Amino acid sequence: MRHLHHQTSQTKLWAVIPAAGSGSRFSKTELKQYQYIQDATVIEHTVKRLSQLPLTGYVLAIGKQDTFASTLSFQDKHKAHFCNGGVERVHSVLNALNYLSQIADEDDWVLVHDAARPCVTFECLNTLVKNAIETNQSAILAIPVRDTLKQVNQEQQIDKTVSRELLWQAQTPQIAKIGILKKAIETALKNNLTITDEASALESIGESVLVVMGRSDNIKITYPDDLELARLILQSQN
């Protein structure tokens, strides 16, 4: 596999990790990104994976009261930047992009990745960035929907079966040029659109977004049980 180092010599690559969320489905009192898997927190594992790419730097958007993140042993910590997160994930990402726009070029590429996805592989990261740069368009990791999907009514009865033929399940990282993504999110927020990921903001301004095949083991830790699954995945990948 061709690696990125020669391709990105002209193009700087940054990462944004929104990590201000409370993750209410995980726990009312604990933050999932700060749970431990083996001897490191989830977010340290996540940064370690992203740091396999030739990043110029990465920005962690954290809660205003968060004093813990800066004490962690992040990979390439000299490349770490911190900014305040926002109310929702989308606001955290925008805050990080505003921070980045002071130190980066608007044509630099930025990967936005969930803090709670520590199992993304280098192969997936490499393929995603390579595809974005070679086609000069935004891109996301995603996997085709495998299961049969049912649309139900309010009584929890099946209305119909939804064709899954063209349906993909979005993952992260999602990559775009800093200036384009910043404009997309600002425009979407101004128009009161619901933004669930970076791609939905990009779609809303007519920006084409490429889907790059991900892996089913790139799980997002959402519930307490997922920690053990992530541990097993990391163990098997190593």
Curated annotation (Swiss-Prot):
According to its UniProt record, this protein's enzyme class is transferase
Metabolic or biological pathway: Isoprenoid biosynthesis; isopentenyl diphosphate biosynthesis via DXP pathway; isopentenyl diphosphate from 1-deoxy-D-xylulose 5-phosphate: step 2/6
- What are the residue positions of the site described as Positions MEP for the nucleophilic attack? R164, K220
Q: Which GO BP terms, alphabetically? A: isopentenyl diphosphate biosynthetic process, methylerythritol 4-phosphate pathway
Q: Does the keyword Disulfide bond apply?
A: no
Q: Which reaction does it catalyse?
A: 2-C-methyl-D-erythritol 4-phosphate + CTP + H(+) = 4-CDP-2-C-methyl-D-erythritol + diphosphate
Quote the PROSITE patterns the UniProt record gives: ISPD
Domain of life where this protein originates? Bacteria
Instruction: Tell me which NCBIfam families the record gives.
Output: ispD (TIGR00453)
Protein purpose? Catalyzes the formation of 4-diphosphocytidyl-2-C-methyl-D-erythritol from CTP and 2-C-methyl-D-erythritol 4-phosphate (MEP).
User: What's the family?
Assistant: Belongs to the IspD/TarI cytidylyltransferase family. IspD subfamily.
Q: What is this protein called?
A: 2-C-methyl-D-erythritol 4-phosphate cytidylyltransferase
User: What is the source species?
Assistant: Acinetobacter baumannii (strain ACICU)
Gene encoding this chain? ispD
